Amino acid sequence: MNSLVLPLCLLALFGFSQGELLVTKKVYFDIKIGNEPIGRIVMGLFGNVVPRTTENFYQLCTGQNGYGYTGSKFHRVIPKFMIQGGDFTKGDGTGGKSIYGAKFADENFQLEHYGAGWLSMANAGQDANESQFFVTTVKCPWLDGRHVVFGKVLEGMDIVKHIEQMPTDSTDRPIEDVVISESGAIELDTPFAVDKTGVGADEEEE
């Protein structure tokens, strides 16, 4: 019996089946459109695959360093592609700040943009990660190997889809402000597995 303990522990720590990933941290965004609260997006992060990227996003969600996502906006929305946010320094997609004090390197490209509901780092080129991120609304294989995937939407994909459908201007900025009114962490007692699939039955596969 004891001979089974170590393999089972290793399985729990480092993953389940080949088609699953282990969520090690949970975070949330409470969203407002204008002054109207519309709901919460809950996201799972993969700290065993991309620990530095996960920690950056986690600490920016909690605001434990005195800065982070609370009060920032989704500044770029493209239907059948993604919604982008995380620029809490300038608010227009030209700013951002990581917990590491500078842009940090692409950690790895082990994870792919498997479908709708995946979190990935926005960047201005190779090894240029700060705080900007995006949430996919379709499968995006052309981004694999270029943007670091680090999380998945667990709850609130309907909120993501609502944002995706909002009217935008010529720069893809929502006409009405989409604000992260509050962000933070959700206690996670035990890591759990999620599938490498898109979120939502109506996901586009293009």
UniProtKB/Swiss-Prot annotation:
Task: Name the InterPro entries for this protein.
Answer: Cyclophilin-like_dom_sf, Cyclophilin-type_PPIase, Cyclophilin-type_PPIase_CS, Cyclophilin-type_PPIase_dom
Q: Which PROSITE patterns match?
A: CSA_PPIASE_1, CSA_PPIASE_2
Instruction: Provide this UniProt record's keywords sorted from A to Z.
Output: Glycoprotein, Isomerase, Rotamase, Secreted, Signal
Q: Per the record's keyword annotation, is Repeat included, yes or no?
A: no
Q: What is a GO molecular function of this protein?
A: peptidyl-prolyl cis-trans isomerase activity
Q: Where in the cell is it found?
A: Secreted
- Name the principal localization, coarsely classed: secreted
Coiled-coil ranges (or none): none
> Where are glycans found on this sequence?
N129
Q: Provide the GO biological process annotations.
A: protein folding
**Reactions catalysed, as given in the entry:** [protein]-peptidylproline (omega=180) = [protein]-peptidylproline (omega=0)
What is known about the tissue distribution of this protein?
Component of the acid-insoluble organic matrix of calcified layers of the shell (at protein level).
Domain PPIase cyclophilin-type: where?
Answer: 28-185
According to the UniProt entry, where is the signal peptide? 1-19
Q: Mind telling me which GO cellular component terms the entry cites? A: cytoplasm; extracellular region; intracellular membrane-bounded organelle
E.C. number(s) listed in UniProt: 5.2.1.8
Q: Which family does it belong to?
A: Belongs to the cyclophilin-type PPIase family.
PANTHER family in alphabetical order:
PEPTIDYL-PROLYL CIS-TRANS ISOMERASE (PTHR11071), PEPTIDYL-PROLYL CIS-TRANS ISOMERASE D-RELATED (PTHR11071:SF561)
* Reported function: PPIases accelerate the folding of proteins. It catalyzes the cis-trans isomerization of proline imidic peptide bonds in oligopeptides.
- Name the chain's protein: Putative peptidyl-prolyl cis-trans isomerase
Organism of derivation = Lottia gigantea
